[in-house]
């Protein structure tokens, strides 16, 4: 049986004036429905060093090798828009990581581990964090 190849999950970040526009790329061979995750970042380049990443799950969430899964969720309102989001996956990353591309992000409550749910829909919002 041929070993299944897992395409890397990449986040491409384009900077434009005072905001970032990001696109998360899913492996072509996985998932259902063909909906690609997008990241929209509202961030003032002159201030906050940290931003919060909230995985969005419009119809569920994505597990590498398993595709889209049903999951618990809550409503999150950001910039007057309401999104579906996982309750338990907010993470904190340094804004400088965005410029280099996101390979891994570190959960705020688990500094020694990496967030494995990189294929989720992500929403990044500007926040002042401790």
Question: Model features per residue range: what roles?
Answer:
Residues 30-76:
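Compact nucleic-acid interaction/catalytic patches
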Residues 22-32:
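An N-terminal domain-cap segment
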Residues 5, 74-130:
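C-terminal terminal-subdomain/extension
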Residues 18-19, 84:
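Mature extracytoplasmic/luminal segments of secretory-pathway proteins
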Residues 23-24, 49, 89:
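Residue-level detector of bioactive/disordered segments in secreted/extracellular proteins
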Residues 1-16:
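Mixed-charge, Lys/Arg-rich low-complexity intrinsically disordered regions
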Residues 20-23, 71:
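Short Pro/Gly-enriched beta-strand edge/turn motifs at strand-loop
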């Amino acid at each position: 049986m041929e070993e299944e190849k897992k395409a890397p999950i990449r986040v491409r970040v384009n900077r434009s004036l005072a905001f970032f526009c990001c696109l998360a790329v899913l492996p072509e061979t996985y998932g259902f429905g063909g909906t690609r995750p997008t990241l929209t970042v509202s961030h003032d380049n002159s201030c906050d060093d940290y931003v919060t990443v909230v995985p969005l799950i419009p119809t569920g969430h994505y597990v590498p090798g398993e595709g889209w899964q049903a999951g618990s969720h809550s409503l999150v309102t950001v910039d007057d828009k309401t999104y579906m989001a996982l309750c338990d996956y907010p993470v904190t990353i340094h804004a400088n990581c965005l410029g280099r591309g996101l390979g891994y992000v570190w959960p705020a409550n688990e500094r020694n581990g990496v967030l494995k749910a990189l294929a989720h829909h992500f929403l990044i919002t500007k926040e002042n964090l401790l």
